A protein has these predicted regions:
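Substrate-recognition "cap/lid" segment bordering the active-site pocket of phosphatases
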Residues: 3, 9-75, 82-89, 107
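Acidic, Mg2+-coordinating phosphoryl-transfer loop and its flanking beta/alpha structural elements
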Residues: 75-120
């Protein structure tokens, strides 16, 4: 099962998913809007101000709580150090997978991702498939 946790607003995330007809592959989607709604709820109930955006693992743990099928593990694929920090802070045991595809300075990004705790760093999706399959 695949899910999305993005720091982008809902309108941006859904635009891309709908444009490329990908939404059907992601039954669970959390966006910046979900973080803001939960922050407002917490403030209203507890008068506490906090940020649930990454690197806070809120979205990842919410995804894990909403998974209805048996899972043997969780992987979080991201291209920023904050993504790996969120994975490592998750109480749900996410493994951080750093993706170098979008980086103009792949060596620098690889160092940053490893430094903040990436469990894996990959250059393509074939490597991701091997990780998930345990090879």
């Amino acid at each position: 099962m695949m899910a999305i946790a993005t720091g982008r607003p809902e309108v941006e995330a859904y635009y891309a998913l709908n444009f490329f007809d990908l939404k059907k592959y992601f039954p669970i989607i959390y966006t910046l809007d979900d973080c803001i709604r939960e922050e407002q709820k917490i403030y209203k109930e507890e008068r506490v101000t906090l940020s649930l955006s990454k690197p806070n693992p809120f979205m990842l743990d919410a995804i894990a709580e909403n998974v209805k099928e048996d899972c043997t593990g969780f992987f979080y694929v991201g291209d920023m150090p904050d993504d790996m920090i969120a994975a490592s802070r998750s109480v749900s045991g996410f493994k951080g997978v750093g993706l170098l595809l979008s980086a103009p300075d792949r060596d620098g990004l690889k160092e940053d991702l490893i430094r903040v705790g990436a469990d894996y760093v990959i250059e393509n999706f074939e490597e991701l498939r091997r990780i998930i399959e345990g090879r």
